[in-house]
Regions:
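Class I SAM-dependent methyltransferase Rossmann-like catalytic core
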Residues: 2-5, 24-29, 41, 49-97
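Residues immediately within or flanking Cys/His clusters that coordinate Zn2+
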Residues: 8, 36
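Short cysteine-rich clusters marking metal-coordination/redox-active sites
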Residues: 11-14, 39
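Conserved class I S-adenosyl-L-methionine
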Residues: 89-122
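A short acidic, Gly/Pro-enriched loop at the edge of an enzyme's catalytic core
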Residues: 97-98, 134-160, 166-170
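Short, polar loop motifs at secondary-structure junctions
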Residues: 105-109, 123-131, 185-188
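A short glycine-rich, Lys/Arg-flanked "PGG" loop and its adjoining helix->strand segment in the class I
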Residues: 165-181, 186-187
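Core SAM-dependent methyltransferase catalytic element
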Residues: 189-209
Length: 209
């Protein structure tokens, strides 16, 4: 986890948002490899191991047997690697800085997107188990709530495997107003507050009001 992301984290428990407290173990090139983040409100602690912050109650990575929302839709053709440039265009980001949140299988796009969008840090939520952190990618695992503060992301992409209502609501919450919201599902069950821009080729694209 990039050390500066600490300021954007929130405890997933149902209480007011408050900045978490970081206790570092190993830090390498501004990436926290081990340590803890603690909540000053409910006093829960969440471990950081191999650079990954685990907010899950069962302390495991995402698996077929894990709790939380499960896939409800598989697009006719998932976004291929060659379409990273298209995804960049859909996000409509100009200039470096800030965070883009990738949820579920969309985290696989991080390496290709970072090559196209220099200076932006990507935050992967419940990434596929083979994924590892990168200098431009921090990984977080959680049960049902994205462990990020409200309205901090310049863009959000939700993968088909987690394109279900609870995760879409959370992805909407962390997105800044006026920014793009992309889902690998042409007909997602979307929260209110999004303006539809397009829906084709297995993707839904909108903007937060």
């Amino acid at each position: 986890m990039h050390i500066e992301l600490t300021e954007m984290l929130r405890c997933p428990e149902p209480h007011r948002e408050e900045m978490l407290v970081l206790s570092t173990g190993e830090v390498k090139d501004r990436m926290v490899r081990s340590g803890l983040v603690g909540c000053p409100v409910c006093h829960k602690e969440y471990s950081i191991a191999r650079g990954i912050v685990n907010f899950r109650r069962n302390k495991e990575r995402v698996s077929k047997d894990s709790s939380g929302p499960r896939p409800a839709y598989t697009p006719p053709s998932p976004l291929p690697s060659a379409d990273a440039a298209k995804l960049q265009a859909l996000l409509e980001l100009s200039g470096p800085g800030g965070y883009v949140v990738l949820v579920g299988s969309a985290v696989r796009q991080a390496a290709r997107l970072s090559a196209l969008m220099e200076g932006i840090h990507f935050v992967g939520i419940n990434a596929p188990t083979e994924m590892e952190e990168q200098p431009s990618l921090s990984l977080l695992y959680a049960n049902e709530k994205v462990p990020l503060r409200t309205a901090i992301a310049r863009g959000v992409v939700v993968g088909a495997d987690l394109a279900t209502s609870p995760w879409l609501v959370e992805a909407h919450r962390v997105l800044l107003r006026g920014r793009r919201f992309v889902v690998e599902n042409e007909e997602p069950e979307l929260p209110i507050g999004l303006v539809k821009l397009a829906a084709e080729n297995g993707l839904w694209v909108g903007e937060k009001r």
